[in-house]
């Protein structure tokens, strides 16, 4: 459960991300594909080369979904219901991949926001991404 401090930390950090949400989302995806090559199997139709327009477009989708989640931290299940259905029933993404992408997002944010990425902010973002991952995998049960 996200505390009021966690929510405040997440909102403040996400405000710093601002218009870079798509760029950071794409960078996190690239990190994931490089660090965890098995994740590429979900994207056989993508050009996974650095700077690929398909990775950039999907990175923007990831970033926009997280922006939506940040705006609805009190109702993540409601805000992410359609996305949860998509990943569970249509795409059948292995739940572990959400943890891998979350890790890559944290690394990306730490890289771009070094002065703002305090231990407290890191912990809050980690809890937030874990909550998002839990919601996205809730329909698997």
Curated annotation (Swiss-Prot):
Among SUPFAM superfamilies, the record links this protein to:
Globin-like (SSF46458)
Provide the taxonomic classification: Eukaryota, Metazoa, Chordata, Craniata, Vertebrata
Pfam families in the record: Globin
Q: Point out residues bearing the modification Phosphoserine.
A: 3, 35, 102, 124, 131, 138
Tissue-specificity statement: Red blood cells.
Q: How does it assemble?
A: Heterotetramer of two alpha chains and two beta chains.
Where Phosphothreonine occurs, residue numbers?
108, 134, 137
Residues found modified as Phosphotyrosine:
24
Q: What is this protein called?
A: Hemoglobin subunit alpha
Give start and end of each Globin domain.
1-141
Function noted in UniProt: Involved in oxygen transport from the lung to the various peripheral tissues.
PROSITE patterns membership: GLOBIN
Q: Which family does it belong to?
A: Belongs to the globin family.
Q: Which residues carry this modification: N6-succinyllysine?
A: 7, 11, 16, 40
Known CDD domains for this protein? Answer: Hb-alpha-like
* UniProt keyword Kinase present: no
Q: Which GO terms describe its molecular function?
A: haptoglobin binding; heme binding; iron ion binding; organic acid binding; oxygen binding; oxygen carrier activity; peroxidase activity
Q: Where does heme b bind?
A: 87
Gene Ontology biological process = hydrogen peroxide catabolic process
Q: Which residues bind O2?
A: 58
